[in-house]
Amino acid sequence: MRGVRGRLAAFAAAGGVHLGALLTRRRGVERATKPVLMPLLAEYVLVRGGPRLLALALLLGAVGDVLLQCEGEAAFLAGMGAFAAGHGCYLALFARQPKKNACRLAVPYGAVWALSVAALWPGLPSQLRLPVALYSLLLTAMAAGAAGAGPRAAAGGALFLLSDGLIAGGLAGWPQARVPQFWVMVTYLAAQLLLVEGLLARPEGNGAGRVPGPVPGEAGQSWTAARASTMP
């Protein structure tokens, strides 16, 4: 149990340092801490015995985080592609959940997507309009799937929508809060953690693709083997 808590504490500590660096504008600390955030959360998933697909979703988020630190449109699109692949992993995980409210959820989330794209479209650079619309459709589908997987996952999906909506608003030239990247990151980190906890809390989220062996009492002994087992 201490091993599990230690992994979660490491993620929380790194997240706190990163957010503090954003607020104090310590660019070097910000850039150094961002790439380690999702790998730390993926490690927590693995020592909890969670699905490898969930760890992969987080590692794809780490790739996106790194790419979005780079300058240029190509890096931005590649980062968006990495996050899109991560959302695909989440969708595959949510597909294992009971689908009691799937149709009812599709309507409001579809409306949110359509209204958001319509509002953002005029302000977006022309070359980013279609990629942003397609990415946001996948993100909205992920959030809708999360909404059917319990309150924590639902909150995580909603916060992911908010976080990426803040980024899209910046691209479209909308007014930004002070230190906008802080709000992007605090909602993003909370979103990923809530999605993880929501999926780990459900038996369906710990089925196929689970890393064999580790349980909370043995977690501290199993990270090396678990990490190796997730490599392609």
Regions found by a protein language model. Name each.
Residues 1-232:
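Polytopic alpha-helical membrane-helix bundles and their juxtamembrane interface segments
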